[in-house]
């Protein structure tokens, strides 16, 4: 810039540029390539002779066309720029506007405005609105400052420019306050520019919007040094614009600004519209439309804030064309006023009111501006009778049932010559050709027929349509209609038209000829009648055949179903994917299909072999789990009995010595005679487990039992109860063996001081993730098991289903919820082979560990695994005190294998009967396997007795050596006897040992429901078919006898001979559990000696839920003796040895009541069908299940079936 010269415009002048200063940074540099007017926002500095006073120059040299006028302006500018500063360079100043249009107006002298202070934009608009001279320099000067402040860099040349322009402004007209070109920017030390700079931020943006909003673009501003290099001849080569823009003040409708292209479009000189009302140029018939658009657009603009961007409404009007000398020559008065159609785009803006440093405009809506971009509409036809292509644009016309046009597309204007407001409100029948009315009648008949089906459309024959210039065009139309679904009346008809053949006259906007087509009266009456018939037909009710309705409903239902499936597929495919091991046989269980209604989006994926298939959601699995929990809770289906009377404990009948402390002594009351069956008398049976615990709550006790076995099992149990005190108890059972097994059980709650874990979100999320994986894995396993289960016969399945109803037991109201343990997943207790075969020594039973330590009345249990002498594994458990009972109980319980004669004798054997129950009452799973090779010494038939025996299986370890193994070391009369005990003695010892460890009571006449009642696979039909049949019973329970086992045989372990003795008597005992069919309390005869309690909590073979007793409650006789070898117990055939057990210990094979260890009895989860334990204080009627005495089998491999006899 310094010292440089260039001649880029005819209006540029060389100016001294020597007065550079860095003191002001508010002046703006020229924006290159802009097509807007430029305003100078800088003031002259003191170096240029103005002392920093605001410049009042205003230059709008639009009318300057001849170059000779530039000379005087150059002189004045050079003269002013030379004051007070030497010229170090020259700069080009452009004082012409970029929006200059060829004008026919004469320049008007501008008033002198030197020294005038700046005004706000609001004052400017008010000045214009009040009719002040638009060429007043102060207004123009202010806008120049506003415009000049928009660019980002400053140049000192503006100071020189301001000095020159201030003089030049006095001799040039300024017709438009918004169109002045800025001169090259300079870095002047200008004072007071800040106001102009901030004020410009709004209108400069507005000016840019005006230019960009309209199709008409003006040529770039003459080049500024460093910007565009526009040549001098570019101004003369400016093309004509096809549209123009104008700005209107919404205060009074005055035009504030127009683009110069208005001259090319309408012929008006550019500033002829300034100061005039815009509506004066609108055709009279379109003024109402224009006003309607304005009143509609203003609220929209105001509701969108100060600057509603791109809120443009479009409509069509006719604008008046200029009648000048060029277009009309002389005699203007005699020529008619001509109008041309334009499509107007309205955009509402707000003028800036208040300047802010952040250039944010604040407006209260008082200075609303309307920006109008007008585009002329041209005719679509170029030649007469033009045949248009199929791709020609379509336009829509909608009319009501009476034929009145209600909507017209703006696209129809160029095709028909009518503006939309010209057609709206008129009858469409007036535009049809008279000869085509018959065709149109047929068309409307088809419209009514198609109206029966919603959305149906059809194309009609071509017909002629009248256009604006009086000619006809041939239209092809696709018709649709809308029928009111309630009134079944036609609401409107929509025609999507396409011009097939154009009119004879191409200019569709020409005025139509005044002459009308002559027609005979007969033809007119005929056409009028056809029009009336069409209107009547359209007014009829649209009938819909029932078949059509059904088809539509069916189609819509199918569409809806398809949509919903797609939607559910998208929604339900969560990110939860669990990588599970590949399984060979993945099948779909019937339960899944029923639960999901056969419409689950996951249904298709169940058979997938992929390990990444989408599993059911966690919510689905949790829902299934909750269902299981509900059914397992045994909802009450029969009234509950009153609390049974309590009886005092009987006198001890034997010399069974208990090592328990005082509070624990009732546990070990009973008889333990030396072999006579009379020790287990009716009296002792009657009061069995019916003792009211009166011992001190909260005190702990220890019980130890010793035996001659070689296995050692230790366990600790903790539990909670309703007592107020706390107590601890430990139960230890010791044997002389070397194998040890241990287990422990924890409980939550109670009064024991356990530090609770702080529940955090992370911990909760972790738990949820683990539960999701756990449940998904269980789901996968449960589906995979069905492939390897042997299928039972159809009849067995029917039987199972037939009796599955009674299988649901009654929920006992008084039962404990076992909050701490109820919902824990069952633990599969497994030991390594070293632990299983830990016993190497002499023959001996396994001593289970017992003992509950916990709150008084607690029920904590402990289970232990101890090795037998032959390397097998047995399990024993301990339990806490019952409610109201001692704080803890411990006893040594063991499964003692009996050795001796190969055939057991019929006599019973002595045991220690227990008169108090320390076990949480759980239902019993019937899973007593009996070896098939042993003879069953059944003295009474189950079918005749009508009693389904509660069967308990006592696994007895067998040494492979001799029957001369040392007897159990009970605190018993025959402890330590060196002689070889008889079979009955060994059995008695085993029973006594087990009874001490786990005192259990079994109820006569009660068949405890099968563990998995929710879903029983057909494979379990044989074992469960007869289980659910309630049968009346009159006989007594039979004694259980354990026969001698063959030595060294593979199946010697866990084999028992069960013989039944004839029932002796049946006596009703108050408060006992009764069968639904025969509510009589069955008592055990003395001959049914103590084999009953010999097996509680024995190794895996014992049905753990057999602990049906309730604390401190009614006398419940034991039912153990009633099993013979024909019982349809769980099958342990080698074919069925492999069982699938889920993660909760539930075996899907229902034959064995397969569940995990005894310990799992007390961590009752939701899978088992057994309910929480009953308290004998609130007994309920139980349904008696009967099982046919057939298909009895003995467990061959107790190691494998260890988890098949625990409670679910």
Curated annotation (Swiss-Prot):
Matching CDD domains: PAS (cd00130)
Chain segments carrying region Disordered: 1-171, 214-235, 636-747, 802-821, 961-982, 1076-1208
Report the residue ranges that make up the PAS domain in this protein. Answer: 242-377, 395-501
Q: Where is the composition biased (Basic residues)?
A: 66-79
Q: Where in the cell is it found?
A: Nucleus; Cytoplasm, Perinuclear region
For the region 21 X 2 AA approximate tandem repeats of G-[TN], what residue ranges are annotated? 698-742
The source's superkingdom equals: Eukaryota
Give the record's subunit note: Forms a heterodimer with timeless (TIM); the complex then translocates into the nucleus.
Record remark: domains? The run of Gly-Thr is implicated in the maintenance of circadian period at different temperatures. Deletion of the repeat leads to a shortening of the courtship song cycle period, and thus could be important for determining features of species-specific mating behavior.
Name of the protein in its database record: Period circadian protein
Q: What is the species listed in this Swiss-Prot or TrEMBL entry?
A: Drosophila yakuba
Q: What is the lineage of its organism?
A: Eukaryota, Metazoa, Ecdysozoa, Arthropoda, Hexapoda
Protein's gene: per
């Amino acid at each position: 810039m310094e010292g440089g010269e260039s001649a880029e415009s005819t209006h540029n002048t060389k100016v001294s540029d020597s007065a550079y200063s860095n003191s002001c940074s508010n002046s703006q540099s020229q924006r290159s390539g802009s097509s807007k007017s430029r305003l100078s926002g800088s003031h002259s500095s003191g170096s240029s002779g103005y002392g920093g006073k605001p410049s009042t120059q205003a230059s709008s040299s639009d009318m300057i066309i001849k170059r000779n006028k530039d000379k005087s302006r150059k002189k004045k500018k050079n003269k002013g720029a030379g004051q007070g500063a030497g010229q170090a360079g020259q700069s080009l100043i452009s004082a012409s506007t970029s929006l200059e249009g060829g004008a026919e107006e004469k320049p008007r002298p501008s008033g002198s405005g030197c020294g005038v202070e700046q005004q706000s934009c609001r004052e400017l608009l008010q000045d214009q609105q009040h009719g002040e001279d638009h060429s007043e320099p102060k207004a123009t000067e202010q806008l120049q400052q506003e415009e000049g402040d928009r660019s980002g860099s400053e140049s000192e040349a503006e100071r020189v420019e301001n000095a020159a322009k201030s003089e030049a402004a006095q001799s040039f007209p300024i017709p438009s306050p918004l169109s002045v070109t800025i001169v090259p920017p300079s870095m002047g030390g200008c004072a007071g520019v800040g106001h102009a700079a901030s004020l410009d931020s709004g209108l400069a943006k507005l000016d840019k919007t005006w230019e960009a909003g309209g199709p008409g673009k003006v040529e770039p501003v003459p080049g500024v040094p460093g910007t565009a290099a526009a040549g001098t001849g570019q101004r003369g080569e400016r093309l004509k614009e096809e549209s123009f823009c104008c700005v209107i003040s919404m205060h009074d409708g005055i035009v504030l600004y127009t683009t110069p292209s208005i001259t090319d479009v309408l012929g008006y000189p550019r500033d002829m519209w300034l100061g005039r009302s815009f509506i004066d140029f609108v055709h009279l018939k379109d003024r109402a439309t224009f006003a309607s658009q304005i009143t509609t657009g203003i609220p929209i603009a105001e509701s969108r804030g100060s600057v509603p961007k791109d809120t443009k409404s479009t409509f069509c009007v006719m604008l008046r064309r200029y009648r000048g000398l060029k277009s009309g020559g002389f005699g203007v008065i005699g020529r008619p006023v001509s109008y041309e159609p334009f499509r107007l785009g309205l955009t509402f803006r707000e003028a800036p009111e208040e300047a802010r440093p952040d250039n944010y405009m604040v407006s209260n809506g008082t200075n609303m501006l309307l920006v109008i971009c007008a585009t002329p509409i041209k005719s679509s036809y170029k030649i007469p009778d033009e045949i248009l292509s199929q791709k020609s644009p379509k336009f829509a016309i909608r009319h009501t049932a009476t034929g009145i046009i209600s909507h017209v597309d703006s696209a129809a204007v160029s095709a028909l010559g009518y503006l939309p407001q010209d057609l709206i409100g008129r009858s469409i029948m007036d535009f049809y050709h008279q000869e085509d009315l018959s065709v149109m009648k047929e068309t409307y008949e088809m419209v009514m027929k198609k109206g029966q089906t919603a959305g149906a459309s059809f194309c009609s024959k071509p017909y002629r349509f009248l256009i604006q210039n009086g000619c006809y065009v041939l239209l092809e139309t696709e018709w649709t209609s809308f029928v009111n679904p309630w009134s079944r009346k036609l609401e409107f008809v929509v025609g999507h038209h396409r011009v097939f053949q154009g009119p004879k006259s191409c200019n569709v906007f020409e005025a139509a000829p005044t002459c009308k087509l002559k027609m005979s009266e007969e033809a007119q009456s005929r056409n009028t009648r056809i029009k009336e018939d069409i209107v009547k037909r359209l007014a009829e009710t649209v009938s819909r055949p029932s078949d059509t309705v059904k088809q539509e409903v069916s189609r819509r239902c199918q569409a809806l179903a398809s949509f919903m499936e797609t939607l559910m597929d998208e929604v339900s495919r969560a990110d939860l994917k669990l990588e599970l091991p590949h399984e060979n046989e993945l099948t779909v269980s019937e339960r899944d299909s029923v639960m999901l209604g056969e419409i689950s989006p996951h249904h298709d994926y169940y058979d997938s072999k992929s390990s990444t298939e989408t599993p059911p959601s966690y919510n689905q699995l949790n829902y299934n789990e909750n269902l299981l929990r509900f059914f397992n809770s045994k909802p009450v289906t029969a009234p509950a009995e009153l609390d049974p009377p309590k009886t005092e404990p009987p006198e001890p009948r034997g010399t069974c010595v208990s090592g328990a402390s005082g509070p624990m002594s009732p546990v070990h009351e009973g008889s333990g005679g030396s072999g006579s069956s009379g020790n287990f008398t009716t009296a002792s049976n009657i009061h069995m487990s019916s003792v009211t615990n009166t011992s001190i709550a909260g005190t702990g006790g220890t019980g130890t039992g010793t035996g001659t076995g070689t296995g050692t099992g230790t366990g600790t149990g903790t539990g909670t109860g309703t007592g107020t005190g706390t107590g601890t108890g430990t139960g230890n059972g010791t044997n002389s063996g070397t194998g040890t097994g241990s287990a422990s059980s924890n409980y939550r709650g109670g009064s024991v001081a356990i530090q609770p874990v702080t529940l955090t979100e992370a911990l909760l999320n972790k738990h949820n993730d683990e539960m999701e994986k756990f449940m998904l894995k269980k789901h996968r396993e449960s589906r995979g098991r069905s492939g390897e289960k042997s299928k039972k016969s159809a009849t067995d399945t029917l039987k199972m289903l037939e009796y599955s109803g009674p299988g649901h037991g009654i929920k006992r109201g008084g039962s404990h919820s076992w909050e701490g343990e109820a919902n824990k997943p069952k633990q599969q207790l497994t030991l390594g082979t070293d632990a299983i075969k830990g016993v190497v020594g002499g023959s001996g039973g396994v001593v289970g560990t017992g003992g509950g330590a916990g709150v008084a009345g607690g029920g904590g249990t402990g289970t232990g695994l101890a090795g037998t002498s032959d390397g097998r594994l047995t399990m024993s458990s301990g339990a806490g005190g019952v409610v109201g009972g001692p704080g803890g109980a411990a006893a040594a319980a063991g499964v003692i294998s009996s050795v001796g004669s190969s055939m057991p004798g019929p006599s019973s054997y002595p045991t220690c009967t227990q008169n108090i129950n320390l076990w949480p009452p759980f239902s019993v799973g019937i899973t007593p396997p009996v070896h098939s090779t042993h003879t069953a010494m059944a003295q009474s038939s189950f079918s005749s007795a009508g009693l389904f025996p509660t069967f308990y299986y006592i696994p007895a370890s067998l040494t492979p050596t001799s029957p001369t193994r040392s007897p159990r070391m009970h605190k018993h009369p025959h402890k330590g006897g060196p002689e070889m005990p008889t079979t009955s003695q060994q059995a008695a010892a085993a029973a006594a040992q087990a009874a001490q460890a786990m005192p259990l009571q079994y109820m006569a006449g009660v068949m405890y429901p099968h563990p998995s009642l929710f879903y029983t696979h057909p494979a379990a039909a044989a074992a469960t078919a007869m289980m659910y049949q309630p049968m009346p019973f009159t006989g007594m329970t039979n004694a259980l006898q354990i026969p001698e086992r063959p030595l060294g045989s593979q199946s010697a372990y866990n084999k028992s001979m069960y013989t039944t003795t004839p029932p002796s008597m049946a006596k009703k005992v108050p408060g006992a559990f009764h069968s639904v069919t025969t509510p009589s309390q069955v008592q055990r005869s003395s001959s049914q000696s103590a084999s009953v309690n010999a097996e509680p909590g024995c190794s895996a073979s014992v049905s753990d839920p057999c602990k049906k007793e309730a604390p401190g409650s009614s006398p419940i006789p034991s039912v153990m003796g009633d099993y013979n070898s024909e019982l349809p117990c769980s099958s342990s055939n080698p074919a069925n040895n492999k069982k699938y057990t889920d993660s909760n210990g539930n075996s899907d094979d229902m034959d064995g009541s397969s569940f995990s260890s005894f310990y799992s009895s007390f961590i009752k989860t939701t899978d088992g069908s057994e309910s929480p334990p009953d308290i004998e204080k609130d007994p309920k009627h139980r349904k008696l299940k009967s099982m046919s005495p057939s298909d009895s089998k003995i467990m061959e491999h107790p190691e494998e079936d260890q988890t098949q006899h625990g409670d679910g």
